[in-house]
Amino acid sequence: MRADDNPSARSLHAQFPGDDTRPTSKKELAGWYSYGWAAEVFTVCAMGSFLPITLEQMARDRGVLLSDKVTPCSASWNGTETTARTHGISPPWYGINATPGTSQCVVYILGAEINTASFAMYTFSVSVFVQAVLIISMSGAADHGSFRKTLLVAFAVIGSVCTMLFLSVVPKIYIVGALFAIVANTCFGASFVLLNSFLPLLVRHHPSLLGHENERSPELNHSHITDDRVQFAANADYGIDADATSPLLQPVQGDSDEHTTSRLPVTSVVISEELKLSTRISSLGIGIGYIGAVILQIICILVIIATRQTTFSLRLVLFLIGLWWFVFTIPAALWLRPRPGPPLPKAPQGKDNRSCVGYMVYAWKSLCRTAVRTRHLKDILLFLTAWFLLSDGIATVSGTAVLFAKTQLNMKPAALGLINVVTMMAGVFGAFSWSFVSRRLNLGASQTIIACILLFELIPIYGLLGFVPAIRKLGYLGLQQPWEMFPLGIVYGLVMGGLSSYCRSFFGELIPPGNEAAFYALYAITDKGSSIFGPAIVGLITDRYGEIRPAFVFLAVLIFLPLPLMLLVDVGRGKKDALALAVELEEGQSSNTQTYGTLSNCERNAVPTDQ
């Protein structure tokens, strides 16, 4: 009989009052997988395809042409089709090219003239900002007490309902659509942080590992597993730590509380088993989520074609995405156990800080403490700066490309959705192929990242070729025809497949041993926070020049800037500095008194998107 089929498997000792030490059940695992299947569709199908063009289209339906600022706008693909048919041309299903700038539209919000494409970019920037603030602020409440599952379900319901409500949003109230988009994206990010926080608990309490309990140190059941090999390798896919209580905010060396004891070594048997199990569960979760996203993406494309690719078609597929998210959240709500965390530590004055304000202060102080420690680590600062710029470029290129294809190339929604399918398939291929290429060419992690950046740089440079007079005369190349978006989507997918794994791996080599959770938190916040700026700047450029193509200059610079920073990172020096800091923190541990908070571990918001 397999271990996970054994209902009599022993549970671990409780580490705090109310600790749920029951073995992980198959139903609980199914609930965890179910939410990945439910929510991944939002980042892939909504944020990656249909939400940006829906916002742009609803604003367009209320806007006027940029050329005369009087003529009302209409759907770019419908308007172009009418022109094509007038000249006896049968337009293809994917759209037809138009003269750049002829279909650019503007709307007036609070007296300001805003390009309809910029409106979608500004909405994305605001949603990312709100998401980052919420994720940090709610971390304390998610870690301590029994709020983890409650918050996950609440965010899932709110986010999915807001997505479904797009069906009722008509162009006349397009601003309401932007508000729904902000709330939905914020709730998605927060819910996935909470989902990822369950994985270490599911692994730790899995029946197949409880048989190795005797091989642990006797005190291990009352300590956090912090071996750096486990912290990174076991959870590289989801970017989370493998500690016992799985907090979003957790103690590290130099901090202590009444629920944390000294760090103890873990036997190689336990490390190996937890590593294998965590990798298996997380990989399966990612695969299930992407399979669901591809299935729904194809369904959405068929629905859009069947409903003649109108604004209503876009609202309808967003309703379907929200409905999918809501329905498949139900098994997660029923089958996942709350798995509460330890009580919130008391403040230095001995006061109980379990109010909402107390939880938020706890979280922000923890994050700040981690940020302060990075000043001792030059190479981590260099890498995080590079990652800030690179992740901003990743998010901005995705949104910019979709809106460029719609407003400049007049591509139809079905074709835009198909680009996303092609990109996802290329991303899966890239995740495996980069590993093969790096081994074949004997490339290190940093060299592979640099290769990805150079390949990534080709995307905006290719778009800038459209400014070259000789190429413009050709009528193709330089992103002048819709079909050119598909090979660029393949390039983007290949790049994402490499960067998503190698950047995290490279960063892991620079972290002080025993501080993985805290520094991966900073890594994730850097990732999320950076996406505030790129889309907003692209929006400003689009408003200034009346079209998106000039923004490729900004994107080319944004993608290039991480390159010299990555070349300055010295792994050997970084490891040496990290070890020195770890020793310093270890030596100071015995002299530390009770602190208010612990270091933030918001790294659990690393998803796949996209986004």
Curated annotation (Swiss-Prot):
Q: Give the sugar-modified residues.
A: N78, N221, N353
Cellular compartment(s): Vacuole membrane
Signal sequence range: none
Q: What is its main location?
A: membrane
Origin, by domain of life? Answer: Eukaryota
Alphabetized UniProt keyword annotations: Amino-acid transport, Autophagy, Glycoprotein, Membrane, Transmembrane, Transmembrane helix, Transport, Vacuole
Annotated stretches, region: Disordered: 1-24
The GO biological-process annotations, alphabetized, read as: amino acid transmembrane export from vacuole; autophagy
Q: Which Gene Ontology cellular component terms are annotated?
A: vacuolar membrane
- Bilayer-spanning residue ranges: 35-55, 116-136, 151-171, 175-195, 286-306, 316-336, 380-400, 414-434, 449-469, 483-503, 521-541, 551-571
The membrane-topology field of this record reads: Multi-pass membrane protein
Pfam families cross-referenced by the UniProt entry: ATG22
Q: Does the keyword Glycoprotein apply?
A: yes
Family annotation (PANTHER family):
AUTOPHAGY-RELATED PROTEIN 22 (PTHR23519:SF1)
Question: Could you say which protein family the record assigns here?
Answer: Belongs to the ATG22 family.
The record describes the protein's role as: Vacuolar effluxer which mediate the efflux of amino acids resulting from autophagic degradation. The release of autophagic amino acids allows the maintenance of protein synthesis and viability during nitrogen starvation.
The protein in question is named Autophagy-related protein 22-2
Q: What is the lineage of its organism?
A: Eukaryota, Fungi, Dikarya, Ascomycota, Pezizomycotina
Chain's gene name: atg22-2
